[in-house]
């Protein structure tokens, strides 16, 4: 059930979705499943070994009732998709609280904000919004162990600007009312909370200024949060980074801190002290550093991302710390051993190691050998205290930056993802718990992951795929080679080695649409190769802003987007982190600024028209300034003048704008909360998000041959929408669009009556000028009725399905079938061809 919220942005989003002509069109998820994504929050009900709640950073909340064999999303139609924390009441296990907004703030990256706190009293079946929407990033939800009405929230606040909403909040009435009980200042939030299980009035909080500061530190309350005092005895004086707190359940006077000490290091190769473990044996009144092992490399310079610490509920000297790797100590934090790399997976992958970058560890209090670990590769389960793991990689939550397609049958989708490398998968992939994931990795790093962005097949030789690591590391992989290890014998680095180059995290790269041997790469200059990357030359002067001028908004001062006209070779447009937009009409010989009157914000997309060489599209994002206004522009005179296309778009950051290759009036926009369509060249917009989960859409592309829109989401993988009702509108009162032929494999499913998993289904689009019930009838070539059923049509475009079974629940034989829709006296029909593969 969708919670009723009244924030203006969410109200505008829902209003467009529910009024859209296309609200009945169903998106089809196609994966991938097996690569996972960043799991930042885990909760298990007490005494229940089958139920697990997993919060994915930007991929909603998921639940299993069978210890990870199958999963379902619980939180996919709310105003927030980013999960900061999830907590289950110990006294009432059906009560689940969610704090939204990622607790992993990033410079130049995506740590999406949330809209406050949500609560379910039925195990996640329905949700109620409890407010605190202005906190943006909630790092912890802490529930009283016996009183379900009492809860505490640690709020980091707005990431990019001063925020009075930071601090600790308390409710005494189940979330109806909130009181801020700890506030440091507008730049210092709270990143962790812990309580004494034997005295729930005793609380600990770690205050943190991203990335470091002196106002933060450890605070303690002995009166359920009414008053707080800072604890300093034996702790470093600062600057202090992130930290986590763990109270030993068996001996609550023993408290641990795992912190990022940002004080200058005495070692020349280290800018600061880094990871340290502190222990108190008097409930936090005094502390001593206990680690004798050097922990600097546990997270190196990335302490703002990690520091989780957990204590065994039965042994106060057994603890775990998380960073790039995960470690265990059996001697109270003096020495640490890395957890094991023996991995089994629900879905098989080529990876062999435990994924890097660990964010959450839960120890089962009933069985401390049972661990649940969340990292950048998903969720891992251990029954031997971390010596071996089962990777529960059966949740479709890939965080995609980029998507492209080819023209094979079925066409393939190429994608670059955060943390989980470059991928390729078929557009007819079926997502269910019985079907192996057909996606495969273009490459993997040695830790079964890697950040990847633009991923493109070589147009001249399908064996080769171009892909990127961050910051300009362009590679080419021979997919028929002996290894998919990036940097291995089958991959080749194409990174330019010219002096003075600076690259943005997501480096723009493309293959020229006019010459497949010509590649372009965007740094602080535009780089070009005419020999597939063997040699490069700069074809522009410095185009970016001064590097490091503003670390948040302009981290490198390089190009973020670069594109060439599909109509005229050598017309190039590039955009930078700081909002500069450049044009060359002579393949880089000369460049001019064309950004007069445009916002000085991160250029999120540059698109050149398929229909008019002088028409350009731009989108900008104010994400890094906490500005969610939509910035979309068009120029019809090669950038001399610009006109806003924001029109009725809701307040959502825009990540991409594309023009339909067949019709210049059809435009598509992907935002931080969905997809929008314009039929009138941007004068007005309608939503395509009604059947899409709340998810950021980072990229989209039109597959023209199959007339489908493919989107890459940052948290829910790739999705496909039929464009036939959009590209070919009809004036008929009832119209059934042609159905694509379907090929069925004969085994093994035919031998398992009633099991439809893994089976293709027929999908077809129907447009109706009024809402109401329709009768669908499938007849064979001989005219006999094969199947008949009722469907409720919305006014506008609808997606209907048929499971390819007869009235007697048997599979239909190969043949040509007529499919008819009838509403009242209106009838419309088309044909469907079913084939058998003969395998």
List each language-model region with its residue ranges.
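Glycine-centered coil/turn sites that cap beta-strands in beta-rich domains
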Residues: 619, 744-774
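Short, glycine-anchored, charge-dense loop/turn motifs used at functional sites
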Residues: 681, 779-785, 817
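Beta-propeller blade termini and top-face loops
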Residues: 2-730
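Short, compositionally biased P/S/T/A/G/V-rich stretches that sit at domain boundaries
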Residues: 726-757, 838
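Beta-strand-rich binding/interaction modules
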Residues: 475-477, 771-781
């Amino acid at each position: 059930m969708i919670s009723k919220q009244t924030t203006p942005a969410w109200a505008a989003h829902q209003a467009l979705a529910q009024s859209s002509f296309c609200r009945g069109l169903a998106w089809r998820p196609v994966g991938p499943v097996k690569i996972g994504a960043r799991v930042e929050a885990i909760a298990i009900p007490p005494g229940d070994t089958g139920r697990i709640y997993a919060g994915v950073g930007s991929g909603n909340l998921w639940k299993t009732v069978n210890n990870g064999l199958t999963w379902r999303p619980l939180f996919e139609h709310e105003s927030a998709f980013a999960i900061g924390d999830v907590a289950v009441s110990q006294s009432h296990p059906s009560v689940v609280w969610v704090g939204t907004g990622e607790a992993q703030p990033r410079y130049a990256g995506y740590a999406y904000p949330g809209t406050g706190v949500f609560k379910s009293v039925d195990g996640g079946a329905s949700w109620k919004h409890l407010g605190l929407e202005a906190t943006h990033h909630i790092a912890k939800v802490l529930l009283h162990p016996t009183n379900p009405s009492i809860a505490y929230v640690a709020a980091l606040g707005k990431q990019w600007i001063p925020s009075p909403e930071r601090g600790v909040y308390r409710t005494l009435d189940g979330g109806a009312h909130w009181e801020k009980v700890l506030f440091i200042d507008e730049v210092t939030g709270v990143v962790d909370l812990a309580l004494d299980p034997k005295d729930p009035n005793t609380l600990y909080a770690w205050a943190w200024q991203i990335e470091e500061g002196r106002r933060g530190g450890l605070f303690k309350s002995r009166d359920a949060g009414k008053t707080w005092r800072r604890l300093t005895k034996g702790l470093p004086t600062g600057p202090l980074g992130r930290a986590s707190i763990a109270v030993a359940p068996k001996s609550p006077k023993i408290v641990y801190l795992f912190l990022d000490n940002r004080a200058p290091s005495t070692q020349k190769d280290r800018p600061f002290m880094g990871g340290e473990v502190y222990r108190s044996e008097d409930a936090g009144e005094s502390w001593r550093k206990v680690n004798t092992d050097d922990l600097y490399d546990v997270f190196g310079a990335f302490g703002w991302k990690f520091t989780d610490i957990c204590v065994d509920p039965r042994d106060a000297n057994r603890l775990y710390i998380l960073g790039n790797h995960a470690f265990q100590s059996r001697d109270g934090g003096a020495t640490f051993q890395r957890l094991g790399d023996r991995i089994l997976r629900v879905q098989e992958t080529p990876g062999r190691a435990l994924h890097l970058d660990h964010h959450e560890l839960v120890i089962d209090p009933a069985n401390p050998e049972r661990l649940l670990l969340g990292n950048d590769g998903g969720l891992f389960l251990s029954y031997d205290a971390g010596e071996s793991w089962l990777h529960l990689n059966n949740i479709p939550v890939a965080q995609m930056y980029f998507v492209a397609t080819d023209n094979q049958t079925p066409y393939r989708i190429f994608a670059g993802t955060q943390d989980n490398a470059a991928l390729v998968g078929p557009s007819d992939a079926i997502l269910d718990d019985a079907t192996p994931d057909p996606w495969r990795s273009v490459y993997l790093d040695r830790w079964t992951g890697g950040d990847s962005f633009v991923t493109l097949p070589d147009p001249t030789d399908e064996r080769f795929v171009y892909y990127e690591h961050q910051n300009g590391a362009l590679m080419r992989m021979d997919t028929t080679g002996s290894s998919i290890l990036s940097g291995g014998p089958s991959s080749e680095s194409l990174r330019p080695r010219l002096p003075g180059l600076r690259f943005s995290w997501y480096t723009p790269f493309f293959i020229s649409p006019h010459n497949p041997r010509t590649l372009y790469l965007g740094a602080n200059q535009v780089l070009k190769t005419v020999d597939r990357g063997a040699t490069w030359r700069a074809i522009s002067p410095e185009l970016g802003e001064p590097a490091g001028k503003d670390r948040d908004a302009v981290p490198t001062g390089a190009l973020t987007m670069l594109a060439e006209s599909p109509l005229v070779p050598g017309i190039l447009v590039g955009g930078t982190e700081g909002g500069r937009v450049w044009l060359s009409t002579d393949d880089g010989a000369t460049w001019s600024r064309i950004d007069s009157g445009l916002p000085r914000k991160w250029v999120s997309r540059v698109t050149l028209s398929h229909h008019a060489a002088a028409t350009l599209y731009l989108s900008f994002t104010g994400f890094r300034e906490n500005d969610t206004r939509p910035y979309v522009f068009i120029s019809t005179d090669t950038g001399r003048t610009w006109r806003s296309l924001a029109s009725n778009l809701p307040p959502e950051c825009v990540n991409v704008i594309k023009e339909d290759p067949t019709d210049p009036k059809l435009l598509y926009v992907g935002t931080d909360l969905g997809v929008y369509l314009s039929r009138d060249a941007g004068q007005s917009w309608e939503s395509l998000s009604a059947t899409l989960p709340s998810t950021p859409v980072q990229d989209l592309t039109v597959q023209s041959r199959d007339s489908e829109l493919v989107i890459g989401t940052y948290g829910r993988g790739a999705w496909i929408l039929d464009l036939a009702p959009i590209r070919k509108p009809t004036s008929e009162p009832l119209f059934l669009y042609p159905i694509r032929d379907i090929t069925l494999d004969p085994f093994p499913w035919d031998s398992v009556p009633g099991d439809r998993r893994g089976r293709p289904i027929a999908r077809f689009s129907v447009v109706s000028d009024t809402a109401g019930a329709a009768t669908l009838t499938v007849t064979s070539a001989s005219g006999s009725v094969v199947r008949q059923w009722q469907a409720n049509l919305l006014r506008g475009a609808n997606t209907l399905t048929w499971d390819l079974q007869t009235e007697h629940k048997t599979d239909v034989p190969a043949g040509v079938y007529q499919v008819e829709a009838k509403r009242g006296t209106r009838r419309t029909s088309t044909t469907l061809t079913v084939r058998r593969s003969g395998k």
